């Protein structure tokens, strides 16, 4: 069976599919954020990915993997405000820098992508796993692929594994107290509510896995 690697045109389609998935979850993400924040997280995510989708539509057909990621990150950051705009923008741009010159995303490149994203969000957000942030989901996805034997795992299966790990980690943030950001000032009031950023990342990973599985 041929390897189902992700080409630059594939990556553009995947990110557009992610934008649609985020749009469908806008109200849910706003509801999650209303419990511990301003209630506009879903709006921010939708606006950011609408900007990504518009940017991707304007890019030349010859754009590379790193170009898709870098331009997407810049578009997301430029269209949104607040911490999540900076974090997701830097995650995408960091992944682009880490995959410079890469022609396709396979299993080894997925590891590089997630590892660079975790490093970017940890640095920009000054957070660590367990702080009830998007990092909890990113870290879980990264760990899931880091512990997978490359020879025994296809890219769709590896991405599915990462998606499941991110989803579980996002839900587990409901039992955590926030240690960074504005939510950290709410104390026990955040208990029982999952972190909206972590849930958003799990939606992104799920959409990526679904697109590749259905291709």
Which sequence ranges carry the predicted segments?
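N-terminal loops that bind phosphate or other acidic moieties
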Residues: 1-215
């Amino acid at each position: 069976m041929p390897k189902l690697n992700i080409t630059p045109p594939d990556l553009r389609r995947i990110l557009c599919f992610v934008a649609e998935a985020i749009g469908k979850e806008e109200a849910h993400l706003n509801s999650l954020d209303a419990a511990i924040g301003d209630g506009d997280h879903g709006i921010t995510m939708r606006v950011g990915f609408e900007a990504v989708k518009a940017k991707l539509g304007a890019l030349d057909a010859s754009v590379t993997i790193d170009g898709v990621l870098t331009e997407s990150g810049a578009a997301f950051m430029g269209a949104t405000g607040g911490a999540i705009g900076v974090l997701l923008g830097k995650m995408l741009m960091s992944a682009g820098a880490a995959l410079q010159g890469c022609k396709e995303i396979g299993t080894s490149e997925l590891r590089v992508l997630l590892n660079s994203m975790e490093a970017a969000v940890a640095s920009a957000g000054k957070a660590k796993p367990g702080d009830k942030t998007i990092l909890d989901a990113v870290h879980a996805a990264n760990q899931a692929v880091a512990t997978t034997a490359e020879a025994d795992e296809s890219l769709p299966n590896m991405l599915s594994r990462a998606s499941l790990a991110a989803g579980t980690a996002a839900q587990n943030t409901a039992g955590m107290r926030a240690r960074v950001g504005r939510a950290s000032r709410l104390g026990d009031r955040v208990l029982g509510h999952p972190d909206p950023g972590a849930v958003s990342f799990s939606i992104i990973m799920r959409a990526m896995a679904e697109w590749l599985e259905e291709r």
